[in-house]
Amino acid sequence: MTGENLIRVDNGGDQTRFPWLGTYQLSRLENQLLLDGLRHFQVFTDGQFPKDVARQSLLAQIAADKSIAQAAPGLNRLIEKVRADLVDGIYVTNLPTEKSITYLLSLTLSSSIGSVFNYGSPNSGRLVMEVASDPSEDQRAELDWRTEGAWVPRDRRTEWIGLLGVENTPGSYTAYAPIKPVEQTLSSHAKAWLYSPSASFHSPHSPASDAMTWSAPRAILSRSPLGHTEIAWPGDAVRAARRDDAIGAGALAELSSEIDQQHVRVSIDAGCFLAFNNLRGVHRQATASDGYCLCYKTYARHSLRALQVKGESGPIFSLAEASASRRDPADFQHPHAAKGKPEYRIHA
């Protein structure tokens, strides 16, 4: 990893290397106009962020429709590119940092991208999740590359993840790599293996010794209904579905190497917002050894229809129902998946 992979808060760095990433820095006037607009909407809730998630969602939708376009037309145009699937991520800086509107700002930005939602467990029914490093615990310098909800069927998995910075120590960052440019550089044999149902994923909530919690043979790479290259990667253990597989280790090593070449890393400081497509790329986080990082995380989808099919209106949905598979073989537990210790992981 080199400095060329870093996009700075001032929008520095070689951004021409990352045409899939849209960036925008609010002017001082746009910052103030957006702050005033969000304050105005919280007047209707006695100046406080509503506790009811349905009211939170409604307030954020109204604020997204009204405040962003009026306060920062350039940012609104960038978000339209997100909604049209023209970019895989956006990095926005110089946003308001006033504590009283931070939750609303987080939801407003994500609501401008899609419908904000969450799963009822293990996130305690909150739309805005606090992601913080714990200085009292030993931490890994970098987490593995991953997609979130890899075990959740595609039409119920989060499409977009939003991260709004609240506090951040220098040296901490989030990295993202879209899979399309990575896939284009892979060798034909690696690509064939990754697109074929050759891997098994282990459930993140089950012990490694439990063979029944390995998925059926599934592909790591796939094509969306619109033809986009997509990836599912749980960040936990993965192994070949067949014990005699001789290609998988090399294919995954090649994939990991190309991700390291194609990714971008950004510092999510206070007033910075990163949103990225969870279906079309992988991400990871790294915290400085003596640092602290706090950001607000949100999930969004273009449509919640598949999540609502069981009768739940949302925006909080049962994780058990969302994870329940219909006919997608990638989500079935498979008693005949190869036994043994995990063989493959993608590392930085």
Model feature map: region roles:
Residues 1-66, 85-90, 124-270, 276, ...:
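Active-site environment of non-heme Fe oxygenases that use a 2-His-1-carboxylate facial triad
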